[in-house]
Amino acid sequence: MAKTLFDKVWDKHVIAGKKGDPQLLYVDLHLIHEVTSPQPFDGLRQAGRKLRRPDKTFATIDHNVPTAPTPVTSVESVMDQISKLQITTLQKNCRDFGVELADIGDKDQGIVHVIGPQLGLTQPGKLIVCGDSHTSTHGGLGALSFGIGTSEIEHVFSTQTLWQVKPKNLGVHVTGHLAPGIFAKDIVMALIAKYGTNFAEGYALEYYGPTIDEMPIENRMTLTNMIIEGGAKVAMINPDQKTFDYLRGRERVPKDFDKAVEYWKQFKTDSPDAYDWIIELDVSDLAPYVSWGTTPSMSVPYGAKLPAVTDKNIERAYDYMDLEPEMPVQDIPINWVFIGSCTNGRLSDLKEAARVMKGKHLAPGVQAWVVPGSRGVQKAAEKIGLDKIFTDAGCEWRDPGCSACLAMNPDKVPAGMHCASTTNRNFEGRQGPGTRTHMASPAMVAAAGINGHFVDVRKFYQGEA
């Protein structure tokens, strides 16, 4: 019987339970951060339990850490007392339970879903969990990864296992060559715009097809990261030679790397017949996507007009966003820019944004923050001069962290601002109370910052702008 990539990794990790019932899974890697770990650690203390496998647990500080003024080197840089408490609590918990921590200022510190692949902790065939909804990111390297809740975190702490009901298989077959200026972000935004925010509920989603085969690894992780906004719990891509080349030489990969590669090669879907549902997506004529409303499904391709009001949700979104029905995308004003996050905070993302901004300057009245996804990304970007391109354009170059993706740290976008953002969520108040978020690719966001409104970035890549 044909199996999917997801089936194969899942089956390798089943300890107990029948098909169709909850099954007990072994967890290879548990990633934790300061926001969702305090209560589970307290639960261990109250029960008098030890952490089952500290060697399979890795912690970082990302959600609450400030990213300016640089350098942010210690918890003393944190002014918000609630944020400081969460950070110092994680530091103490890691000391008490023997967990490795990428602390503030450490060379490995950064967003949890950026540093996992960067360090080589993320590997094909692994089962990875984290108390964060965008844990599916790691599926871009062929791992089975998903977000878990507080009680589940404590269960993994105590047993290194987790009870789960196996979801069905959804294949997204992507064909067509991406035009210059079109990126993975546009693909996933187009999917969610067409099918909605819950179409993949109850499914493990796998992207496949010639477009995916051509795609660089960091772009693949954008796909697996953001499809959570379409309802999927798990998103995966078959590991291939690009995956193995990406991982080779990274700090935490197996010592006998070639032997590991031979093991990883088994993790691939046998046949599309193994999927329960297949979506076909031809991206040959895909345009850059921009979100206009307050859910990721409220997005349109460049060149389209915003939709007419057809229900109260759309009416409320227009009221919050201070936009007019059927206005052109290019008429959306932009006065703030954020480049970063676990969706688009990697080196390749910063390169594309810098490519657009090089030799130009932000439009009058526009403020921009560029926040690398990790200390490693920051150093690599500075080594090739990306920081100077951004600062010459008028942007602030900051230290790594989740930053303005979410209003949980000092990096809040002011109320009323229209922010072009490379993030994955555009809910009301997501980037700060009253903030209006417009998601797009790093290239589109950079171009919007230069022009003060959205433009067709494809023209830049065609040498016309």
Swiss-Prot record:
Catalysed reaction equations from the record: (2R,3S)-3-isopropylmalate = (2S)-2-isopropylmalate
tRNA-binding recorded as keyword: no
InterPro entries membership: 3-IsopropMal_deHydase_lsu, Acnase/IPM_dHydase_lsu_aba_1/3, Acoase/IPM_deHydtase_lsu_aba, Aconitase_4Fe-4S_BS, Aconitase_4Fe-4S_dom, IPM_dehydratase_rel_enz, IPMI_cat
GO molecular function: 3-isopropylmalate dehydratase activity; 4 iron, 4 sulfur cluster binding; metal ion binding
Superkingdom of source: Bacteria
UniProt-listed GO biological process terms: L-leucine biosynthetic process
Pathway(s) this gene product operates in, as recorded in its UniProt entry: Amino-acid biosynthesis; L-leucine biosynthesis; L-leucine from 3-methyl-2-oxobutanoate: step 2/4
Cofactor: how and how many bound: Binds 1 [4Fe-4S] cluster per subunit.
CC cofactor: [4Fe-4S] cluster
Keywords: 4Fe-4S, Amino-acid biosynthesis, Branched-chain amino acid biosynthesis, Iron, Iron-sulfur, Leucine biosynthesis, Lyase, Metal-binding
EC number: 4.2.1.33
Pfam families: Aconitase
Chain sites annotated for binding [4Fe-4S] cluster: C342, C402, C405
Keyword field contains Cell inner membrane: no
Protein's job: Catalyzes the isomerization between 2-isopropylmalate and 3-isopropylmalate, via the formation of 2-isopropylmaleate.
Description of how the protein assembles with itself and partners: Heterodimer of LeuC and LeuD.
Similarity remark: Belongs to the aconitase/IPM isomerase family. LeuC type 1 subfamily.
Name used for this protein in its record: 3-isopropylmalate dehydratase large subunit
